Amino acid sequence: MNYTLTRILSNSKENRKSLQEDDSATLLIEQHVNSNIYLGKLKHILKSIVKWGRGNSLWPYNFGLSCCYVEMTTSFTAVHDVARFGSEVIRASPRQADFMVIAGTPFIKMAPVIKRLYDQMLEPKWVISMGSCANSGGMYDIYSVVQGVDKFLPVDVYIPGCPPRPEAYIQALLLLKEAIGKEQRPLSWIVGDQGIYRANMESERKRKHNERAKMTYLRSPEEI
């Protein structure tokens, strides 16, 4: 391969540019300013700090219904160490908890108690449905079991399984943390032109019902 060397004339008029005309110098100045001076709105950075704090310090409410609660408490042992995600502080009072895990079978007699405990939690608050019984009633398709806790509570994360493993519970925490980081409003109450009102958030089960109803092929347990 042949190379051609050309000498640069430093005194030519084409190479003489002022600092304002030099694009590389302008780009360097802009990068220096953007890296040292925050030019955005203060409320944006404050919201990001608040969401970071909420996502990394999720305190669960100590509440269990049946066997899924055993798997939930297993995640607090040294083997799984859920303290890595700031969620090891189990609270005995709903007023001190950030989210509630419905771990087990929600019976109809227990539904008013669960709803009352949820109402006692302070905003912002979240709900994790853990296990098949909490998600859809599981194998208890009977009169005494609520067919899904989202019948009376807004659920943020669903954990499939009967019962789910502790790793599934940890993954649900990470999904909840990711969802908190994407929230556009700090609380579930919205201050609008017509006053203060609460957002009517549709449950994921209801939103995805039509899509899931179109499924005609279901895998057998041997294929899973």
Curated annotation (Swiss-Prot):
Record GO terms (molecular function): 4 iron, 4 sulfur cluster binding; iron ion binding; NADH dehydrogenase (ubiquinone) activity; NADH:ubiquinone reductase (non-electrogenic) activity; quinone binding
Organism: Baumannia cicadellinicola subsp. Homalodisca coagulata
Protein name: NADH-quinone oxidoreductase subunit B
Protein's membrane topology: Peripheral membrane protein
Annotated cofactor note: Binds 1 [4Fe-4S] cluster.
Protein localization: Cell membrane
E.C. no: 7.1.1.-
Keyword line: 4Fe-4S, Cell membrane, Iron, Iron-sulfur, Membrane, Metal-binding, NAD, Quinone, Translocase, Transport, Ubiquinone
InterPro entries, per the entry: NADH_UbQ_OxRdtase-like_20kDa, NADH_UQ_OxRdtase_20Kd_su
Domain of life from the UniProt record: Bacteria
Gene name linked to the record: nuoB
UniProt catalytic activity: a quinone + NADH + 5 H(+)(in) = a quinol + NAD(+) + 4 H(+)(out)
A Gene Ontology BP annotation from the UniProt entry: aerobic respiration
Cofactor(s) this protein cannot do without: [4Fe-4S] cluster
Binding positions for [4Fe-4S] cluster per the UniProt entry: 67-68, 133, 162
Family that this chain belongs to: Belongs to the complex I 20 kDa subunit family.
Enzyme class: translocase
Gene Ontology CC terms, in alphabetical order: plasma membrane; respiratory chain complex I
